[in-house]
Structure formats: C-alpha cells, structure tokens
From Swiss-Prot:
It is found in: Cytoplasm. InterPro entries: DUF3459 (IPR022567), Glyco_hydro_13_cat_dom (IPR006047), Glyco_hydro_b (IPR013780), Glycoside_hydrolase_SF (IPR017853), O16G_dom_2 (IPR045857), Trehalose_TreC (IPR012769). It comes from Escherichia coli (strain K12). GO terms for biological process: DNA damage response; oligosaccharide catabolic process; trehalose catabolic process. It is an enzyme of class 3 (hydrolase). Belongs to the glycosyl hydrolase 13 family. One of its GO terms (cellular component) is cytosol. This is Trehalose-6-phosphate hydrolase. Its EC number is 3.2.1.93. The record marks 325 as: Transition state stabilizer. The gene is treC. Pfam families: Alpha-amylase, DUF3459. The active site is at 200 (nucleophile), 251 (proton donor).
Amino acid sequence: MTHLPHWWQNGVIYQIYPKSFQDTTGSGTGDLRGVIQHLDYLHKLGVDAIWLTPFYVSPQVDNGYDVANYTAIDPTYGTLDDFDELVTQAKSRGIRIILDMVFNHTSTQHAWFREALNKESPYRQFYIWRDGEPETPPNNWRSKFGGSAWRWHAESEQYYLHLFAPEQADLNWENPAVRAELKKVCEFWADRGVDGLRLDVVNLISKDPRFPEDLDGDGRRFYTDGPRAHEFLHEMNRDVFTPRGLMTVGEMSSTSLEHCQRYAALTGSELSMTFNFHHLKVDYPGGEKWTLAKPDFVALKTLFRHWQQGMHNVAWNALFWCNHDQPRIVSRFGDEGEYRVPAAKMLAMVLHGMQGTPYIYQGEEIGMTNPHFTRITDYRDVESLNMFAELRNDGRDADELLAILASKSRDNSRTPMQWSNGDNAGFTAGEPWIGLGDNYQQINVEAALADDSSVFYTYQKLIALRKQEAILTWGNYQDLLPNSPVLWCYRREWKGQTLLVIANLSREIQPWQAGQMRGNWQLVMHNYEEASPQPCAMNLRPFEAVWWLQK
C-alpha cells in the first residue's frame, strides 16, 4: 500500500508534560509560555507536532487527568490567550498541536458531576450509578489505582463507578447527551487551531451493561474494548474527527491486535493510530508491575513482530518507549553508566526503524535517566503512593518497595526537563513541584546541543530520515534473530529496497553473523564513531546499533 502519506505517517510527534517542561513564573510548575519559549529547540530537533498532556482546570489528583472543565485552562498553566499564541508560534515553525482528551471520566469537581449528585438532575445520567449497600458495592471490580472501582454517595444512596481514582468518575457513554457534549469539546479546540487529539484510555469507554461480578480477575474484561467501543469511536470520527481533519491517537489499555486493527484501520473510520503497552510489560513478571525484574528481550521482540506484521497494510501503529506514565527507557532497557549514550542511541535506532508514527517524550532525546529518588516523600504520583501504602500494609519491606518505585514509578518520567547545569536545571527560578534528577549537571540540553555526538543529534537525524526514506513509512518487517536475547536484527523491504537494522541489547561484546547479505549497501546510521560500510560478520560493541540501506 503506497500513496502520499498523511502528515503523521512520516512525521514524528514530541510529547510535552507541561507541568515539568519549563516554568516562566517562578511558581515551580511548568506553563504554556514555557512551551513557547522552547519552540525553536523543538524546531531544531525537527518534530512535526507536539502533544501536550492536560492543562485544563483540574484539582490535580491525577496530574490533570481529572478534568474539571474541558474548555478552560488551569491558571497554573496560563490563559487561552497564551494557548492561542502557542498555536500561532508553533504553526509558524511548521509544528502542529495535539491535545490530550480525557473522555473516559471527569473530575468529581466537574460541573456535570456536581449536578449529577442530585438524583433528579438530567446530569445524573452522565455518570454510571448503581444500587448497593454502604459496605457492599455493586460488583467486585477494582480501580486501576487500588481498592474498589465503586464509591458510595450517602445522600443519594447509590454508588458511582470510577475505574481510576475516586475523584475520577466514569462517564456514561451510553447516554447520547454525553457524546454530544464531548463532540462540542473537540469542536472548541479544533476551532482554536488544534490538529490532533490523543484520547486517554479510550478503549475503556464502553462497559458491559450487566456489570457482572468478575470471578477470575479485577473486572477489566468487562470494560476493556467493551461492547460498543468501536461504534462510539466510529460515531465520533464521523461527526468530528474526519470533518475537522483531526489526527487521533487512542491510548489502548490492555488491548489486542485484533481490536487495534479495527480502531486504527487504514480506511480511517475510527482513529488514525493506537498506542498499546504490551511491550512495556516485559519486565512485569507474571503481569505484576510492582516487582524488580530484568526485561525479557525475546518477549519484547516477539511483541514488536506481532504488532509490526499484524498492523502492516491493515492499520497504523504509534511507536514509543517513553511517556509520562513510564520510567525512562535508557534506565529501563539500556544503561545509566558508561554506556548511557550508545544505549540511548541504540534504543532510538531500533524503534525509529519500524513502521508507525514515533513519539519522543521530553528528555528522551537527550538520554535523561530515572531520577533515583530514595524517600517516599520524594514521590507525588497517586498510583505510586497508593501502592506503597497498600503493599506496606501487606507487610512488605519499605526499602524493597522504594527500590521498586525507583525503577517503576510514573514519577520517573515526571521530573523537570533538564535544560542546563544551572539552578534547578534551568527549569524554574522557584521551588520545583517535584525533585530533579540527580545528574542534570551532566545530562542537559545545553550540553547535548554543544556536543555533535550527543543523543540529541541521533534523534534529529532519525526524524529527518523518516521524511527522506519512504521504506521507513511503508516497508514490511522481518525479525532475523527472533530467539536471541542479546541481538535485535530486523529487515524491512519495500519496492526493491531493503533496510537492515542490527543492535546489541547488552553491555557485552556480541558476535553477529551477517549471513546472506549480498549486494551493495549504504551505511545510513550508527551509534559509535565508525561502523562497517557493508554488513559483514562482526563483533558488536556494547549497545552498538547500525542501519544499512540497499536500494
């Protein structure tokens, strides 16, 4: 399948967590003017769009994913005038704007929910209410953040559903009035020049209307990719996404390839593309996140093969290692010590060689690491604090849990962007809302830009190559060493061209046999000072990666 690509099919998107990007007021919290301040930096990197995580009015129970007003900007972040200026300034540099839409739930501070507390209000039907007794919820479904997924409301003597925090009440998508209001939100932002939407946990919007007990789990099988999810997204697409030319990416929690082939079908009847997270659970032994475990690289490669081959010519992938909910990838699958730079470059080269739209999370392009927090008071994340309390309650050792948090907490990616080696890494003149990484004096944007062999310039080149080489957009995917736990070697083919990507996933030198690599190759990318101009038998250095292209 080849045609002129949509902008996002050969583009790269940069994710900004505004709270931790740049503070311009001294409040200790980043803001929209801080994003404007660094647009030239993002333009230099070469990204096509920026996705901003929520900056709407919010009590900040879940860092803005508890929205109290979808069309008002939280004063902490600025004003609508600031936002309009951001759009204008970004577009003048060829950078599009993507906003985060949290449509599975609202904050319990939202006007709709406040109205819904009255049983007679039409807004009651905007949420999911069920009968029960004060100590007996309607079913045994669990919240993603721990505890029951139901919260009792004494005045109206019913429970409401919250798949996340109790302050995040799930919307009732069965109600057409809810869908109509959410379409208006999309229209509001499209009118202000927004080019795309990232839809938070959007495959959870349709619940099994029977709300059955889950005898084998936490309830997720009754609302994940639920009965009407495709129908609802088809309607949103028909009424808003397509008419307004919005690119859409759905965050898909615990989804399947088969569902994503429908959500992100190239026919474009639901969404443009999907995020799935299976590849970021290869260090969750038995599916358990709160453990210390090395990644299973054979499983990682198997998952990428499954999705690359399963989506090829059928649907569109989003490619990512990092976001605001995941630890830093170089700490997780690479190295924080002497091999940090080649490891960060290798991980970038492996991902950006694949089919799909790559996403870069702020700081990933300079190889930022986890911050190495040592005290529970360092953490801000509701999920981390809840899990620590719950597991301590179960008798688990505090030091063990702190080691797990230092490896797995969502706060690992939420520390301030490291701009310079100055005070607070150049992020704020005030007291930062969360502590800084302990290595910002060495790892920062200023240092990266001054060093032409830094991780930054590898990302810059990968972004440029995506526009230059159509094989990256359209080629197929073949894993050449699926069973190796230390080498990742894949080939992509398209219209008589071949791209070969090889990578050493380990700290040790690894021999690689080139096999039947005939013909004339061009060396395209490498992460050490020099590399073989042709694929041949070689010893790959720690975290070494090479791309060759045959035309």
